[in-house]
Amino acid sequence: MYIKTITIQGFKSYRDQVAVDPFSPGHNVVVGRNGSGKSNFFSAIRFVLSDQYTKLSREERQRLLHEGTSTSTTLSAYVEIVFDNSDGRFPTGRQELVLRRTIGLKKDEYSLDRKSASKSEVDQLLESAGFSKANPYYIVPQGRITHLTNMNDRERLRLLKDVAGTEVYEQKRAESTRIMEETDGKRDKILELLTTIEDRLRELEEEKEELKEYQEKDRERRCLEYALHQRELEDVTNALDEIEAERRQDIHDSNEKRKEFNDREDEIQRYEEALTAAKHSLSTTQASLRQYETERADLVRNKTELECVIADFETAGQVGEHRRAELAEELEVMQQKVDEATARLEDLVQEAEQRIGEEKAAREALEPTQSKLSVLFAKQGRAQQFATQAARDEYLRDEIKALEEHEKNQGRRVEILQNEVAGAKEQLAQLSAKSEQQAQGENDRRENLKKMNEEIAQLQTNIAGMHEQKKELWREEGKLTQIEVNAKSEMEAAERSLMGMMNKDTSNGLRAVRQIAKRLNLDGVFGPLYDLFEVSDKYKTAVEVTAGNSLFHVVVDNDETASKLLDVMNREKSGRVTFMPLNRLKSHSVNYPKANDAIPMIQKLQFDREYVMAFEQVFGRTIICEDLQTAAHYTRSHGLNAVTIEGDRVDRKGALTGGYHDVRRSRLDTVKAAKKWRTAYETDHARHIEVKAALQNLEQEVTRAMGQVQALEAKKRHISDGGEGLFKLLTLPARDLDQARDRVTRLESSLEEAEGASRDAKAKRASYEEELRTPMRQNLTDEELRELETLTQSVESQKKLLFDATQSRAKAVGERNRLEIELSENLRRKRQELRDKLDRLEGEAGNGELQSGEVELRRNELRNLVRDIEQLEEKVSESEGRVDELNSEISKISENLERVQTQQMENTRAIMRVQKNAERYLTKRQTLINRREECNNAIRDLGALPEEAFSKYTDQRSDKIIKRLHKVNDGLKKFAHVNKKAFEQYNNFTKQRDELMDRRDELDQSAVKIEELIETLDQRKDEAIERTFKQVSKYFEEVFETLVPLGKGELIMQKKTDGFIEEESEESLEQGREKSDIDSYTGVSIRVSFNSKHDEGQRIQQLSGGQKSLVALALVFAIQKCDPAPFYLFDEIDANLDAQYRTAVATMIHTLSTSAQFITTTFKSEMLAQADKFYGVFFDKQKVSTIKVIEKEEASDFVETAAQVGQL
């Protein structure tokens, strides 16, 4: 075994966690600067191995924690040593042992293999591995070698005794001495008690004779009293038997009456349920009857209204047909007028166009002639106008320039008018196309109106069918509402009754569980136990008694679900409840009796096998028996709970419970009723919701269909109203067409005028230009005069032609315009109005087919109403008959119920009388039992009776026995002073005397054994000291000779004899051991020689410092050989050695390291020469130490550097 690794954290200078690399099982050397933490490293090992730092105070623990210059504070520290246990020195069975010690300001803890351990366990484990408290020299810290060199002889003797283990012997001897003193004290007390007892025995011997006479009289008294008490006891027992027989008969009669009571209760319950059902049926039937009557009245009113509507339709159809004929005739006349006017208008249009052409040709012919004539007149008057030709030319040029500008303006105007004419013609073409489109739109409108009338008729038919479905659903909804209200009322009543059978906290808890489970959507909540099973009425009382309040326990899938529910319930403070998590319940095997008169209760329950654990928990150890005797038998034989069908229960622990059970307050019946009505309510409610949903869907369908009808009607009205708009649209294009034609005409006329003006200006400009090229004359030339005369005549004739053409054109255009106005504003409008009236009549009547379809629809609806009224008449008749039947049934059930209730009251009074008799029986029985108990107590108080007491006075009369008893009591009065316990006291004191004498003998034997033990301990202690001295002395000589081959050394025991101190070597001590006394030893001295094996040698006080250190080391090695340890720790043991001895010490350690581990620190190179592994200790500026493996050369360099620094 050896130290494998060491981990340090927070201990002294080792602030951070330092894990030392595995040590060599041989020789390990640790080097480092002074103050770097080498000694703290050894202190950490000693801290764990407990040879130091035991029972630390808070201040001492504080000093062990790291205190550096960093700002962080170390609050705890630990040192962990891992031992190689391959040789099995630690009895743990593992290859390694991990030992850790942890300290803090308020803790000091050990752990073994990562498990907490006490200090005593650690000490025992270390001692079992060879770590002796008597020999702590397997760890040699700094200063111990110096301490050994400075020891005097007496201190070395004390050290030898510690190594020999004399402290253990001293402790055992002190304990034996203490026990010996206690034994002497006990023996003295026993002697005093024996003296007192002997004196008391002599006094009791004198009282025994008088007591014997008293006992004879007392024996007779007890026999007489026994005879009297026994006779009374027999009388009381006989009376009890008679009462018990009467009680059993009464119980039998009571059971019969209770059975009748229970049967009658069931009958009453059946009658009440039948009565409730009949009343509910009556209420439902009456509600249906009222609904049928209301519907019948509504249908009769609707039938009357529908008949009136059909009559109105028929009348309106006849009037509409006559009016349509008149309008059609008027429309035909008006159409003829429009056609005639249109033909006349076409002729007038052609004539107007012709006259306009003639007017245009006349104007075009007049304009150039008149222009030339104007030029000649102007030229003629130019001579009077201008004095010179230059003035004339200037004027002509100005006129030519003005005419050119006028010509340009007229040209632009012509261009503008040409564009306007083209635009007007295009607009005229668009208006013509639009007029044709609107005419086509009118035809489409009529077709759409026809289709919409057909769609409206179909939708109205569908709506009528849906109204019939709604009526059926309304009737069903009314019926369901009444049924649902009744079911809910019964369910709430049953649940209130059930909640009244438990405390308020449980009731609130069950309600909260249902709400929380629904709110959190917990699927693992199965509900209260009573909701999860069914049982026949025969066993319900037995089941109720067995389950008790467990019926209200809530079954869940696992404890996690229960925890969620409990958390919310605690947070909301919503009652209390007990949960049964199925994953926590265990199945137990039960040995049921294999007999017909013992039925396992769980076999009579019907439940889902998923909940079997919960039911086994409550009912698994219970059986059902016929009577209490059978139940008690099986309870004793099989250790089960047993219950009778009536509810009397025998507990396997011995308790017997039973009595009357009110069947009217049965929890299971209430649960059954609650479940029944809850199921009925949920079914009715679900159906009610379905009916409501169906009604809502139908309402939506009807609303949608009516919306469609309204939309079609609105669209139809819009199209019908659009007829007038369409007329306006048709009229407006005609008017617009006329206006467009007029505008084209006006624009063309303006264009002609502009073109004529342009031509006139052009002709004038040409004349002026021509005149400008000729010389100015006072008069016209002859040719010009002839032309002037000709042009004058021509202009006059052309003007007359133009006037005539203008008059003809104005007349033709006026007639055309008047006819157009008449056609568009009068004839066409009247024709459209007639068409609209005819369309409205056709729309109101449904364009013939719609009107007849509407009438037929109304007639079908009337037939359906008649059929529905007949059906309702039948239903009303059936409902009235059903009401009469139910009233008769209710009356009959009420009579039967009243009769049974009267019988039940009589039976209840009879049961009450039996109960009162039972109470009287119980009172009388208790009195007799008390009297019997008194007799038994009296007999028991008589004590042990002689044999004659059971037969001596059995045949005598009671009065004689009483007379003789008085006489014997008078004789006993003279013995009033006698010590009645003399015999008992004598026997007790005799027994005590014998026991004390035995105890005294035992104490004497113990004292002898203790004296022998003390003598043996003294002898063993002397032997241990002598043996240890011999071994240490021997090993000292061997070690010293190894270290100093030329010298020798020995240990000398000093002994005090008659005031003188003698010295004995190992040989002389061996020879005189039998005569010696250990107590006479005064010390151990050391004598050595370093250069001779034969001279006397020197005492240690005479040696140099280096020699003293070597001698001390030799002594340490000798002690270690005497009691070897698995490893050794040496802290700078070679510090004071001379150079010539350091090599010898290093060689010895290397030799010893083959069988034990060595960990040493040094500043000398000799120790490094033969070491196996090297470690360096370093510290930083914050004085935090670390340790790590280094190479041998690095360790040598460090030692040499340290030596050089020391020399400086």
UniProtKB/Swiss-Prot annotation:
Signal sequence annotation: none
Summary of subunit composition and partner proteins: Component of cohesin complexes.
GO biological process: cell division; chromosome organization; chromosome segregation
Predominant location: nucleus
Subcellular location: Nucleus
Organism this protein belongs to: Cryptococcus neoformans var. grubii serotype A (strain H99 / ATCC 208821 / CBS 10515 / FGSC 9487)
SUPFAM superfamilies, per database record: P-loop containing nucleoside triphosphate hydrolases (SSF52540), Smc hinge domain (SSF75553)
One Pfam assignment: SMC_hinge
Known role: Central component of cohesin, a complex required for chromosome cohesion during the cell cycle. The cohesin complex may form a large proteinaceous ring within which sister chromatids can be trapped. At anaphase, the complex is cleaved and dissociates from chromatin, allowing sister chromatids to segregate. Cohesion is coupled to DNA replication and is involved in DNA repair. The cohesin complex also plays an important role in spindle pole assembly during mitosis and in chromosomes movement. Is unrelated to urease function in C.neoformans.
Gene ablation phenotype (knockout): Does not affect urease function.
GO molecular function terms noted in the UniProt entry: ATP binding; ATP hydrolysis activity
GO cellular component: chromosome; nucleus
Keyword entries, A-Z: Cell cycle, Cell division, Coiled coil, Mitosis, Nucleus
Protein family membership: Belongs to the SMC family. SMC3 subfamily.
Skewed-composition ranges (Basic and acidic residues): 756-773
Segments of this protein annotated with the region Disordered: 748-773
UniProt entry tagged with the keyword Coiled coil: yes
Protein name: Urease accessory protein 2
SMC hinge domain mapped to chain residues: 523-633
Coiled-coil segments on the chain, per record: 187-362, 400-469, 688-771, 817-903
Keyword Oxidoreductase: no
